[in-house]
């Protein structure tokens, strides 16, 4: 990183990694909460029913597809903004 000492750069990297872990845990927690709430409604058994299991699989797949698309779109927007700034 420009203008940073090696120690400052390491500290910044550690902070960024910590933030990324927190963000991942937040997204994961929301995924679990959303899919559990949407799919699990029978608490008479420890095991998931076939319907609940299928619902959770579809919910997780849909959420992951959405996250992937959002990441792609943010990348596209970032590339466009970077190109625009370089033209100026």
Curated annotation (Swiss-Prot):
The keyword Mitochondrion applies. Transmembrane segments: none annotated. Its main location: mitochondrion. It is found in: Mitochondrion inner membrane. GO terms for cellular component: mitochondrial inner membrane. InterPro entries: Mito_inner_translocase_sub, Tim10-like, Tim10-like_dom_sf. A motif (Twin CX3C motif) lies at residues 35-59. It is a peripheral membrane protein. Pfam families: zf-Tim10_DDP. Keywords: Chaperone, Disulfide bond, Membrane, Metal-binding, Mitochondrion, Mitochondrion inner membrane, Protein transport, Translocation, Transport, Zinc. The twin CX3C motif contains 4 conserved Cys residues that form 2 disulfide bonds in the mitochondrial intermembrane space. However, during the transit of tim9 from cytoplasm into mitochondrion, the Cys residues probably coordinate zinc, thereby preventing folding and allowing its transfer across mitochondrial outer membrane. This is Mitochondrial import inner membrane translocase subunit tim9. It comes from Neurospora crassa (strain ATCC 24698 / 74-OR23-1A / CBS 708.71 / DSM 1257 / FGSC 987). The gene is tim9.
